[in-house]
């Protein structure tokens, strides 16, 4: 079926160079994800765990039996990233990544995308990149907020918190890239979004037993 049969019309506006294809697909993917109320609620409530971690870590410091013991932010950042990975990042990958390619297949979007000078790499990077960006919002930003709160509350030195934040940044990048690549990859398994969603959930939770 040609793209004209799908209702597309010739575009008479400004044409951007092919090098911007990835950016265009990324913006489209982010816009499509933002229209989901699940994504909006996840981004909204993803800040609750970090506030809890700030309060609990502060309480732990105040009630510490050894006042001379130095505050170590590393385990707190590890627990925070783990909590965000198993909750907010999982939901984002499920809602915006695990059905991305299946959605395009069902709506014949490939006929539109690949009628233009769009390469498979540009398409995949754009689709995966949106999941990565959204996952960074719920992993890296909370880690940064936690580090800033610890500095403001004088829990640990600035140097220790900066080093811990750099370590958490690397962890957030690994988590976000993994979630983007794996979830979008699973979305190519089948045209059925229900199948790809189920496969993603099984992969994510079954290994944890």
PLM features: what roles do these ranges have?
Residues 46-50, 130-131, 143, 201-205:
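Residue-level recognition of pore/gate-forming positions within transmembrane alpha-helices
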Residues 93-97, 110, 145, 181-182:
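Hydrophobic/aromatic residues in alpha-helical transmembrane segments
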Residues 100-130:
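Helix-loop-helix units of permease transmembrane domains in multi-pass membrane transporters
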Residues 10-13, 55, 72-86, 125-191:
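Secretory targeting signals
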Residues 52-62, 191-209:
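Transmembrane helix segments
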Residues 80-103:
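Long, hydrophobic alpha-helical segments
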Residues 18-20, 27-45:
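Membrane-interface helix starts
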């Amino acid at each position: 079926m040609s793209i004209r049969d799908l209702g597309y019309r010739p575009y008479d506006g400004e044409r951007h160079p092919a090098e911007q294809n990835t950016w265009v697909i990324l913006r489209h993917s982010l816009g499509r994800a933002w229209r989901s109320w699940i994504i909006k609620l996840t981004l909204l409530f993803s800040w609750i765990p970090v506030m809890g971690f700030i309060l609990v870590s502060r309480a732990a410091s105040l009630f510490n039996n050894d006042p001379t013991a130095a505050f170590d932010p590393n385990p707190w950042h590890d627990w925070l990233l783990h909590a965000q990975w198993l909750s907010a990042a999982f939901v984002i990958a499920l809602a915006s990544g695990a059905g991305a390619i299946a959605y395009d297949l069902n709506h014949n979007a490939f006929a539109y995308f690949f009628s233009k000078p769009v390469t498979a790499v540009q398409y995949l990077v754009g689709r995966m990149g949106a999941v990565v960006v959204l996952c960074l919002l719920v992993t890296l930003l909370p880690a940064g907020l936690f580090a800033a709160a610890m500095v403001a509350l004088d829990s640990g030195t600035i140097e220790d918190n900066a080093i811990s934040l750099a370590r958490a940044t690397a962890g957030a990048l690994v988590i976000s890239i993994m979630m983007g690549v794996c979830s979008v990859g699973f979305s190519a398994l089948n045209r059925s979004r229900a199948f790809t969603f189920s496969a993603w959930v099984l992969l994510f939770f079954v290994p944890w037993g």
